[in-house]
């Protein structure tokens, strides 16, 4: 089933079941299918003053779906088991598609897992420019960095997800 351009309704027109099925039901089903089947792969990046080294055995993945200007996304980064380095400075995380850079700053949520003490942290995602966002740890309200709220090391995990309006 393909998208059908929505009909321009005329005053006093009789709305039939066939018209509603074509212009409402079928298009809504198409939009629902795009959200499920329309995911694209994306490789998120973490940058800082000195970029972190994820090490051997690391895992980086992400997916996003775009319907019009609406972008839904998720990402997962796991540091490897050896050869990791936290780098230095505030962490900035790439977005799959440039955002419009004018709407609300909060564009999602996430979790961080510090494997050493087996501790999880919750965070909000704040856009910083059209292509990147940063994490704000929920309890301390500090920006996530190479040393806050913990220094990432072997097997630590960052996960994030959200929805935002794209630039185009």
Where are these regions (language model features)?
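Extracellular attachment/recognition segments
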Residues: 50, 97-138
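Generic short beta-strand segments
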Residues: 43-49, 74-80, 138-141
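Beta-rich globular "head" domains
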Residues: 57-116, 159-165
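Glycine-rich, low-complexity segments
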Residues: 3-56, 100-104, 109, 154, ...
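Short acidic (Asp/Glu) and glycine-rich catalytic loops that position anionic groups and cofactors
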Residues: 1-4, 74
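Domain-scale recognition of soluble eukaryotic interaction modules
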Residues: 128-168
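Short, surface-exposed beta-strand/loop "edge" segments at domain boundaries and coil↔beta transitions
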Residues: 81, 117-121, 140-146
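Sterically constrained small-residue positions within well-ordered secondary structures
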Residues: 64, 86, 126, 151-153
């Amino acid at each position: 089933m393909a998208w059908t351009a929505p009909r321009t309704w005329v005053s006093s027109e009789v709305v039939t079941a066939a018209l509603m099925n074509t212009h409402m039901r079928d298009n809504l089903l198409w939009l629902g299918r795009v959200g499920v089947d329309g995911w694209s792969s994306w490789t998120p990046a973490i940058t800082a003053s000195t970029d972190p080294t994820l090490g051997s055995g690391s895992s980086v993945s992400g997916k996003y779906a775009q319907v019009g200007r609406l972008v839904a996304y998720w990402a997962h980064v796991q540091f490897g088991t050896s050869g990791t380095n936290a780098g230095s400075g505030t962490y900035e995380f790439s977005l799959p598609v440039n955002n419009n850079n004018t709407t609300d700053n909060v564009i999602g949520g996430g979790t961080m897992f510090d494997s050493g003490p087996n501790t999880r942290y919750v965070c909000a995602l704040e856009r910083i420019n059209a292509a990147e966002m940063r994490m704000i740890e929920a309890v301390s309200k500090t920006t996530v960095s190479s040393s806050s709220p913990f220094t990432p090391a072997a097997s630590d995990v960052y996960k994030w997800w959200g929805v935002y309006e794209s630039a185009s």
